[in-house]
Amino acid sequence: MFRFNPQLSHGCALALICCLLNLLMMHQPTNAELSPVVQGEFFLPILPDDHPPNTDTSFGGPISNLYDNLLQREYAGPVVFPNHQVERKAQRSPSLRLRFGRSDPDMLNNIVEKRWFGDVNQKPIRSPSLRLRFGRRDPTLPQMRRTAYDDLLERELTLNNQQQQQLGDTADDLSADYDGLYERVVRKPQRLRWGRSVPQFEATIGDNDQLYNSLWNSEKMRRMLLALQQYEAAPGHVAGYANDGDDTEAQLDEDTSEFQREARKPMRLRWGRSTGKAPQIETSSIAPKN
């Protein structure tokens, strides 16, 4: 009877594996001619060393397409050709560059040609005296659009120039007329300061009777005279004139005392100070001891 030996089975398995590996190694060169290798997006075949070089292959097409495709891509680094030539992508000007890789076709048509002076490669620099401020246009440059405001300004300028020419021709004739315009006209005051009013009578009155009549006709003078008459007709006024001169002076002194300012003692000083005098009645919150 046949007995199963585990060591023999392991040895057979190892022998079979080695045979399979040898068979695979023998068939690998023949299959390499037909197995493409993926490089990027193109399938490039791996040819043996003894195969003659050929630019046209049956699988990947011409190899120049690979470099054309690389040139169309936006790589950060330069593209290196087989002959060690380096080609970089052209940098576009920021003024012509749009967002998201777009180009502006209108910018090429709207580029203004620079003005050059002869053979000197120098841009014209306008001096400050010729530079116009506040957005005004240069009269030497052609106007792009003419508006009604421009016509109005031109009409006003022509009228001003004509008037100046006429004034220049007849300056001697109008000098006498224009001298009086610059003299200041002296007018009578409509009102005086501090509430005073202008007298109603004329200052050219030379006769005293006319002056007296004008004062009498004025209402202010009439009121003053009426008040004086009432004051003289009062009984106290008559009794005062009947007394002696001393009594009259004493009465006048008493009357003037009303207009004198009364000098009072200070009730308190500033900043909490006291007058320094002791009060007449001392008050104490502490009860005296018996």
From Swiss-Prot:
Residues 1-32 form the signal peptide. The keyword Magnesium does not apply. Keywords: Amidation, Cleavage on pair of basic residues, Neuropeptide, Secreted, Signal. This is Short neuropeptide F. It is found in: Secreted. Belongs to the NPY family. Residues 281-290 have a biased composition (Polar residues). Residues 244-257 have a biased composition (Acidic residues). Residues 33-87, 138-290 form a propeptide. Plays a role in controlling food intake and regulating body size. GO terms for cellular component: extracellular region. The modification Phenylalanine amide is found at residues 100, 134. GO terms for biological process: neuropeptide signaling pathway; regulation of multicellular organism growth; regulation of response to food. One of its GO terms (molecular function) is neuropeptide hormone activity. Residues 238-290 are annotated as: Disordered. The gene is sNPF. The keyword Isomerase does not apply.
